[in-house]
């Protein structure tokens, strides 16, 4: 805790409000609300916390607060601040999570369509459905029963659906608008669960067709009746009153929360929404934040009723949702809430079970690898790979895996300094010497295992430096690839031998992940460096364009192509004098090519562990 935070903690009021945590860059990383700002904010910097809260606190270098008149006002402000700033430690619902709806359009001749966008356009919307497949299944059934308009053909034409009996051909039929509006109402009744009348009509038509010896048509009506029955079976009735409601339940354990929302439409449970996330406040307060965000999503229509658990502030939810809010005490509605809570508990337990299994697999892999190589369990593994093209821009990279998982903050990148031309062995010698010379000088913790992406030659070079030059006792292994550039063999021992390692084992998969990751990291760094060198060389020799201005151009435009496409005015905006900007354009566009402004997404050249070793 720095002096700034200590000073601000003394100034905190006991009022309700919101607090805003910031990191060293001034970025908002967490927004919270409190009934008592002083007690809540001070709690972050006193006593011990679980791992996730410690991670948050370790990044806080400043905070602000906003006093509100009430707890509910603080809740509403918190939701808006989260939506505006998207802090990384807050609950964030996925923006792209939308469900399909069946829509009866508000047109002269209505259409039946599937949509994910709900608009206030006078149309009727039914849903949400669990996925587009479920929505299409219902729509296909409705298309067979109700011949709505399917196309926008001119008055003299009919569409394909007319010929198969699924369109009335509104352009030529004698039916008026009232007929189609009546049909739309029947569909609406059907989607609301009132399908008895439709089944009775189909049964009557089936009987008439059978009496008229039209057995194929009678069979079609029979199939439609059976399809409706199947649909009824899939959509279990959860409440006899056939209301539309959302049912919320939540469960907390080990610092995590799971919220489940049941979508009950016309008394039938048609879908659920599941979200798991770490929580930092009291569970009931973070639950309220979740509810507020939930109904900000356009795809979440507000139903007639919202059911919530007993421990939630009913008035706070009413401030968030314009609907009837209930905390049921007994009966069907209470059972629905209990079911949502039970499912939240099961989902959270499954998460922890899967996590434990994943940890067991990874831990088992590194333990088995240690036994296989007859070394202590390699908790920390450092791996190296070189990258160059015909000796140009040679680089090397190191990735680190701790407990079988990437530790990206420990990744390192190396520009090769002493090697001329494509000499992979010499490059490996330089990098190993630089890395472990530093480990030795600064008394850094050495790895339990070094893995070289290469064969016998590269491994022997690493051994010479580590064991003979530096006198360090660190096991070194090599990973050879086959002609398809896939992980093939593990080399280890003195002399080096191929280790008998099953390709289906967790140990092999771990080594494969390490080799793929170090190769990716090295080649990404090489491409960046090559691009930068190409950029600089083409801008050499321009009067008034020194290293600093080149760097500014690179930072702003990200690529030489975008500088070529930029106008002189755009280059001037970066801080380059106009006469120099004109010289840049003359050199990059010697043929006087037309310049155009291209709006493209900027490339982010920041990568993991963006550190260069000395």
From Swiss-Prot:
Record Gene3D superfamilies: 5' to 3' exonuclease, C-terminal subdomain, GIY-YIG endonuclease, UVR domain, UvrC, RNAse H endonuclease domain
Molecular function terms from GO: DNA binding; excinuclease ABC activity
PROSITE patterns reported in the protein's UniProt record: GIY_YIG, UVR, UVRC
Transmembrane segments: none
Keyword Transmembrane among UniProt keywords: no
InterPro entries from the UniProt entry: GIY-YIG_endonuc, GIY-YIG_endonuc_sf, GIY-YIG_UvrC_Cho, RuvA_2-like, UVR_dom, UVR_dom_sf, UvrABC_protein_C, UvrC
Highest taxon in the source lineage: Bacteria
A Pfam family the protein falls into: UvrC_RNaseH_dom
Similarity section: Belongs to the UvrC family.
Protein name: UvrABC system protein C
Organism whose genome encodes this protein: Streptococcus pneumoniae (strain ATCC BAA-255 / R6)
């Amino acid at each position: 805790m720095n002096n700034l935070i200590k000073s601000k903690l003394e100034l905190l009021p006991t009022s309700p409000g919101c607090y805003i945590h910031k990191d060293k860059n001034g970025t908002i990383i967490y927004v919270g609300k409190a009934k008592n700002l002083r007690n809540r904010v001070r709690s972050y910097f006193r006593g011990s916390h679980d791992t996730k809260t410690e991670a948050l606190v370790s990044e806080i270098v400043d905070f602000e607060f906003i006093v509100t008149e009430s707890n509910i006002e603080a809740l509403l402000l918190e939701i808006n601040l989260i939506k505006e700033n998207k802090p990384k430690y807050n609950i964030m619902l996925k923006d792209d999570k939308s469900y399909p709806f069946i829509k009866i359009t508000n047109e002269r001749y209505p259409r039946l369509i599937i949509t994910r966008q709900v608009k206030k356009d006078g149309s009727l919307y039914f849903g949400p459905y669990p996925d587009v497949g479920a929505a299409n299944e219902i729509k296909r059934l409705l298309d067979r029963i109700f011949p709505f308009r399917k196309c926008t053909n001119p008055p003299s034409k009919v569409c394909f659906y007319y010929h198969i009996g699924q369109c009335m051909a509104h352009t030529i039929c004698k039916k008026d608008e009232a007929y189609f509006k009546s049909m739309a109402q029947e569909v609406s009744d059907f989607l609301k669960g009132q399908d008895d009348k439709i089944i009775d009509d189909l049964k009557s038509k089936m009987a008439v067709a059978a009496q008229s010896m039209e057995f194929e048509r009678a069979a079609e009506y029979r199939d439609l009746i059976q399809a409706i029955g199947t649909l009824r079976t899939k959509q279990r009735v959860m409440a006899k009153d056939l209301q539309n409601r959302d049912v919320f339940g939540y469960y907390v354990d080990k610092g995590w929360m799971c919220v489940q929302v049941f979508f009950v439409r016309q008394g039938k449970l048609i879908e659920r929404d599941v979200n798991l996330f770490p929580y930092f406040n009291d569970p009931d307060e973070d639950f309220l934040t979740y509810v507020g965000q939930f109904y900000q999503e356009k795809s979440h229509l507000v139903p007639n009723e919202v059911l919530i658990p007993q421990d939630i502030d009913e008035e706070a939810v009413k401030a968030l949702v314009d609907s009837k809010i209930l905390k049921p005490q007994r009966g069907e509605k209470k059972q629905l809430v209990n079911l949502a809570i039970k499912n939240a508990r099961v989902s959270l337990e499954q998460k922890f079970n899967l996590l434990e299994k994943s940890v067991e697999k990874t831990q088992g892999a590194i333990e088995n690898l240690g036994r296989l190589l007859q070394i202590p369990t390699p908790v920390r593994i450092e791996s190296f790979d070189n990258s160059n093209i015909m000796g140009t821009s040679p680089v090397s990279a190191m990735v680190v895996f701790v407990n079988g998982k990437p530790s990206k903050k420990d990744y390192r990148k190396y520009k090769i300094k002493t090697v001329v031309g494509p000499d992979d062995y010499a490059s490996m010698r330089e990098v190993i010497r630089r890395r472990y010379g530093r480990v030795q000088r600064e008394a850094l913790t050495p790895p339990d295992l070094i893995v070289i992406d290469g064969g016998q030659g590269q491994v022997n070079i690493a051994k010479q430096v580590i064991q003979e030059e530096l006198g360090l006792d660190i096991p070194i292994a090599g990973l050879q690839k086959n002609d398809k550039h896939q992980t093939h063999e593990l080399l280890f021992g003195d002399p080096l031998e191929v280790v008998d390692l099953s390709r289906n084992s967790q140990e092999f998969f771990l080594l494969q992940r390490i080799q793929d990751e170090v190769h990716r990291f090295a080649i990404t760094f090489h491409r960046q460096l090559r691009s930068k060198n190409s950029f600089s060389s083409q801008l050499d020799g321009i009067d008034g364009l020194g290293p600093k201005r080149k760097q500014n151009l690179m930072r702003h435009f990200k690529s030489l192509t975008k500088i070529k496409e930029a106008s002189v005015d755009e280059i001037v905006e970066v801080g380059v004098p106009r006469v120099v900007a004109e010289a840049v354009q003359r050199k990059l566009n010697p043929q006087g090519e037309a310049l155009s402004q291209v709006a493209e997404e900027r490339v982010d050249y920041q990568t993991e562990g963006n550190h260069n070793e000395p």
